[in-house]
C-alpha cells in the first residue's frame, strides 16, 4: 500500500516532468511524419556540414540548442517508452519535493553535461535519448535521500540497485552483444555527475525544500 503522498500525481501538477515527456513524444511523432534524417538534421548534437572535401559530423558550435536537444531523439519505440517511464518515475518525485524550477535545472544540467561527455566519449557520432537525464534525476534523488532525508519521496531501494547495476553492465559491452544496441555510457555518467552536482548545490542553497 502507498501512503497518499506516494501516489504519483496528475501530469498537470508536475509541469516540468510532463513537458520533458511531451517533447520526447512530439519529436518521436515528428520522426515518423517527417523522417528521422530531417529530425536529426535539426536536433542532433553533431550537425552534418560540408568541410570542403566531404560531408562530416561537426561539433555544435554556436547552434546552442544542440547541446540539449539530442535527449529528445530516440531510436525505436522501446527506447522512447522506457526512458519516458523512468523520467516519470524519478521526475515527479523531484518536482513534487523541490519544485518545477529545480527539476528543470537538473534536467538542463543532465542534458548538457550528458551530451557533452557522450561527445567526448564517442567522438563525432549520432546519439540521443533521455537516459542521461534519467541518471541525472536518479543521482539527485539518491544524494538527497542520504543528505536530506524527507525532502523528496524516495523510490524503492531496489530501483537504485538496478540503476547502478545497469550503469556498470553498460560498460562491459554485454548489452550491445545481446541486442540492446549501442549504449551511451558517456551520457549516463555525465548525467549522473550532473544530477549529483545539482543536488549538492540545491542542498547548499536551501535549508529546506520548497516550491520555486
Language model regions located:
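A detector for small-residue-rich transmembrane helices and their helix-helix packing motifs
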Residues: 1-212
